[in-house]
From Swiss-Prot:
Probably modulates the generation of the hypoxia-typic morphotype (called H-MORPH) with altered biofilm architecture that leads to increased host inflammation, rapid disease progression, and mortality in a murine model of invasive aspergillosis. GO terms for cellular component: nucleus. This is Hypoxia responsive morphology factor C. Residues 151-181 are annotated as: RNA recognition motif (RRM)-like domain. A motif (Bipartite nuclear localization signal) lies at residues 46-68. It comes from Aspergillus fumigatus (strain CBS 144.89 / FGSC A1163 / CEA10) (Neosartorya fumigata). The keyword Metal-binding does not apply. Belongs to the hrmA family.
Length: 342
């Protein structure tokens, strides 16, 4: 019985993550059980005529259910909504507080977008449950937002139109892409109009952040602007040279069997430099991302992990910028970058 219930809870988690909504078909059930959580059953008043046993049993079941629901809310807030939707009050009779810890500790929680969270917050306020309703406003993870594009279950776009790319990226980034080792190899193979130096990935089943990967070679000006502290260490400790052009000339000199796949990863890009270095279109798309909104809510104002850079540690220094952008503006970019006039 427990196994079946836990599987139903996990199925509900996946459904809520996919739909990015907790209302719709479940609205009446959700309202009923949130009301139970936020408003304890009133004490039965004494009567001249004794109440039926079923009334006492029903009252006890509600009290028992509320205790279990609150136990889940306190210890597993990200499973709370799936739990109350799947487990009705009557079924809580067989649950014990100790079992809640044991059975739910391995369940994955819900991870909803900020827009969905705002909608749910507004829904809770309209119900006017009272002070305890504040508990229900913390059901969305306060941890760093993830995106399914970091896994394999994503749509991938790999061949961008270079003529369109100049509209979305700054001149500096466009030139960095054009002079990158990967792009130079494409040109040698007559891939002039399209490039795999610009790739995008989107989640299949929800509207989490999209990922943009740009092969930009090693442009010292880009690195110094976005990651000034990291650049100082790269140049002083690891001996990186400041000329990207000199590294590009070493492509043919590097023997294949000596190729080193390891890389340095730079995170915490300077936010104020993003509009200049990456361009205003990309900056707006980054601001729209769930990750950037989370960073802002958590007072990470001057730097962002929405922009990271991988640099190979040996020549030719190949660099890949990884950008987290909002879903809607990411879709707009993709429809332009990957639409070719034939």
């Amino acid at each position: 019985m427990r196994t079946k219930t836990l599987q139903s809870i996990q199925d509900m988690v996946e459904q809520l993550n996919r739909r990015q909504s907790m209302l719709g078909d479940y609205e009446s059930t959700l309202e009923e059980r949130l009301a139970l959580v936020c408003n304890p059953p009133k004490r039965l008043q004494r009567m001249k005529i004794p109440r039926r046993k079923s009334e006492y049993s029903s009252h006890d079941r509600l009290k028992r259910a509320r205790k279990i629901y609150l136990e889940v809310l306190e210890n597993f807030p990200l499973i709370f909504v799936p739990f109350i939707l799947v487990v009705p009050p009557n079924a809580c009779r067989t649950w014990k507080a100790s079992e809640v810890q044991r059975h739910l500790k391995d369940c994955e929680g819900i991870h909803l977008s900020y827009e969905t969270r705002a909608n749910f917050d507004g829904y809770c306020r309209t119900l006017r449950f009272g002070l305890e309703s504040a508990l229900t406003l913390n059901l969305v993870s306060c941890s760093r937002p993830t995106t399914i594009t970091e896994a394999d279950d994503a749509w991938a776009y790999n061949a961008a139109d270079m003529d369109t790319a100049v509209k979305f990226f700054s001149e500096a980034i466009y030139k960095a892409i054009e002079s990158s080792p990967k792009r130079l190899r494409e040109k040698e193979n007559q891939f002039v109009k399209s490039t795999q130096c610009i790739q995008m990935r989107f989640p299949r089943h929800n509207q989490q952040d999209a990922i943009v990967r740009l092969d930009v070679g090693f442009d010292s000006e880009v690195v110094k602007a976005l990651f000034p502290t990291a650049w100082e260490r790269l140049s002083s400790v690891h001996g990186f040279r400041s000329s990207s052009q000199s590294t590009n000339r070493n492509i043919e000199q590097l023997e294949p069997h000596l190729y080193d796949n390891a890389c340095f990863t730079l995170q915490g890009a300077t936010v104020s430099e993003i509009p200049t270095v990456l361009g205003p279109h990309v900056y707006r798309a980054i601001k729209e991302s769930q990750l950037r909104q989370w960073e802002t809510d958590n007072f990470l104002l001057k730097t962002t992990d929405c922009v990271s850079l991988d640099i190979s540690r040996r020549q030719p220094y190949e660099g890949t910028l990884c950008l987290r952008v909002g879903f809607s503006l990411g879709v707009f970019m993709a429809t332009q970058l990957y639409s070719f006039d034939r």
